[in-house]
């Protein structure tokens, strides 16, 4: 319904005081409170398709802000706690919440496409910092307990955070419409965080293959714009992957 009728949700229909999307966003907490996690993710994707149909950029950005309010509140709370005590990012419940929030963002990005940039810009640097901390946590756990530790639920969820982060970035870049903006604002911190982590991860089992698919998607999308960064990408991923 959201896909086929998206324009109807963002324009005022006969008998309505405001577009239906406004009503959905103002009651979103009561709508999702009884849904399972997977249903919440599907709901967010559906609402994202509705918002993507809005033709006014300013109004659309305001809708996106309301739309992401709930996950952003939880995200901000965890990031705030982590800024005082990074060990919160080893807490199973916090890690589980981050997994769900990132999956929600992946679905929102899929639906919104390039306009998702307003949300991505809000969480981007914190998300890359979380990525680096998760890598350190995973490497420490493997060093202490061996590769078998990667089967534990907490470590699995830490790896999912890394995978969903890469999926989110690759998904948005592939849908973006401004290559120069992507290259200037999003690629430098990404390469610094992800490539360095991949290269220095001593245990092959701790490396995420999604790093390779993310880099491939970015190079494919940006083409000639990213040529200058290709040697850096090769230096970080080629030799250590083959080994």
Q: Could you tell me what each predicted segment is?
A:
Residues 1-243:
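Karyopherin-beta/Importin-beta family HEAT-repeat alpha-solenoid scaffold
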């Amino acid at each position: 319904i959201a896909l086929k009728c998206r324009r109807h949700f963002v324009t005022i229909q006969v008998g309505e005081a405001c577009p239906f999307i406004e009503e959905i966003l103002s009651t979103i907490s009561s709508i999702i409170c009884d849904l399972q996690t997977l249903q919440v993710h599907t709901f967010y994707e559906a609402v994202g398709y509705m918002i993507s149909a809005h033709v006014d950029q300013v109004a659309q950005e305001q809708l996106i802000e309301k739309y992401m309010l709930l996950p952003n509140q939880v995200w901000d709370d965890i990031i705030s706690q982590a800024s005082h005590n990074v060990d919160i990012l080893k807490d199973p419940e916090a890690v589980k919440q981050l997994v769900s929030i990132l999956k929600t963002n992946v679905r929102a990005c899929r639906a919104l496409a390039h306009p998702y940039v307003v949300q991505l810009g809000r969480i981007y640097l914190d998300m890359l910092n979380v990525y680096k901390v998760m890598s350190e946590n995973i490497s420490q756990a493997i060093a202490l307990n061996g590769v078998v530790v990667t089967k534990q639920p907490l470590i699995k969820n830490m790896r999912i955070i890394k995978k969903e982060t890469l999926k989110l970035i690759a998904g948005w870049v592939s849908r973006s419409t401004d290559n120069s903006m992507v290259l200037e604002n999003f690629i430098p911190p990404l390469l610094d965080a992800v490539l360095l982590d991949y290269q220095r991860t001593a245990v092959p089992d701790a490396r995420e293959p999604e790093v390779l698919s993310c880099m491939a998607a970015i190079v494919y999308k940006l083409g000639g714009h990213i040529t200058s960064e290709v040697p850096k990408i090769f230096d970080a991923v080629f030799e250590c992957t083959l080994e």
